[in-house]
A protein has these predicted regions:
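Enzymes that bind and transform nitrogen-containing heteroaromatic metabolites
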Residues: 1-101
Length: 101
């Protein structure tokens, strides 16, 4: 098992993703909303594979950006729809290309 540490007090995502790419991995699946938000805020994510459910869920469901600085109406990245897939008649997968200002 190979273990590579990056950063002093926290992982250095740019270095970690560079190393992953050098090992031949071109795609990384990130399911942690706060880390996904971090990658977007650093302009390190080029695609967004986002799950949309047509079922309303209340409470603290919106966790993307919850622990980081939120994007405002003038500084958020735009997206272009790449594909739409459905799991059932009430659960869809939307894939977007992220476009930074």
């Amino acid at each position: 098992i190979l273990v590579i540490a990056t950063g002093d007090k926290a992982p250095d995502s740019k270095v970690a993703l560079y190393i992953i790419k050098k090992f031949g991995l071109d795609k990384v699946l990130v399911e942690t909303p706060s880390y996904m938000h971090y990658l977007v805020s650093q302009k390190m994510m080029d695609e967004l594979f986002f799950n949309y459910s047509c079922i309303y869920v209340g409470g603290q469901a919106l966790t993307i950006g919850k622990y980081g600085q939120e994007f405002g109406s003038k500084d958020h990245p735009h997206t272009r729809m790449l594909s739409i897939h459905s799991h059932s008649d009430h659960f869809f997968y939307f894939r977007h290309k992220l476009i930074y200002g």
